[in-house]
UniProtKB/Swiss-Prot annotation:
Any one biological process term the GO annotation gives: coenzyme A biosynthetic process
Annotated keywords: ATP-binding, Coenzyme A biosynthesis, Cytoplasm, Magnesium, Nucleotide-binding, Nucleotidyltransferase, Transferase
Pfam families: CTP_transf_like
Positions with a binding annotation for substrate: 10, 42, 74, 88
Organism: Salmonella arizonae (strain ATCC BAA-731 / CDC346-86 / RSK2980)
Protein name, per record: Phosphopantetheine adenylyltransferase
Biological pathway: Cofactor biosynthesis; coenzyme A biosynthesis; CoA from (R)-pantothenate: step 4/5
Length: 159
């Protein structure tokens, strides 16, 4: 039986920290779905289609990764995709409380849905999409934190 996992997030935009998590997940699971949430309430900089395209290009070298957008409940998306594992990244203790709430709610909605928490590599432990966008808005160099295609897209958005 194939182990299918979902790594959900807004990915606005996808960072090297996200790529670190998804790359490591590909070594643990047969198939990883990078699930990009529409998240209209977060007022994303990039459209859902743009975020999907950026992530597809950034993960093209990972043969067992599929990128898909979604706007439904995560538990419903997981059920539809026949995945029973959620991958979540934990950067700091502060992330844990919120992630624990999400894990319990998802498990309530889909009892067989397990959450697996991965810590990013030390190099990426402090970055977030929001922080990268904020630094870039103030002309800070964020090249190191983003895949090349994403960096170019971000610079174009900020022009």
């Amino acid at each position: 039986m194939q182990k299918r996992a979902i790594y959900p997030g807004t990915f606005d935009p996808i960072t090297n920290g996200h790529l670190d998590i998804v790359t490591r997940a590909t070594q643990m699971f047969d198939h990883v779905i990078l699930a990009i949430a529409a998240s209209p309430g977060k007022n994303p900089m990039f459209t859902l289609d743009e975020r999907v395209a950026l992530a597809q290009k950034a993960t093209a070298h990972l043969s067992n990764v599929e990128v898909a957008g979604f706007s439904d409940l995560m538990a419903n998306f997981a059920r539809d995709r026949q995945a029973n594992i959620l991958i979540r990244g934990l950067r700091a203790v502060a992330d844990f409380e919120y992630e624990m709430q999400l894990a319990h709610m998802n498990r309530h909605l889909m009892p067989q849905l397990e959450s697996v928490f991965l810590m990013p590599s030390k190099e990426w432990s402090f970055i977030s999409s929001s922080l990268v966008k904020e630094v870039a808005r103030h002309q800070g160099d964020v090249t190191h934190f983003l895949p090349d295609n994403v960096h170019q897209a971000l610079m174009n958005k900020l022009k």
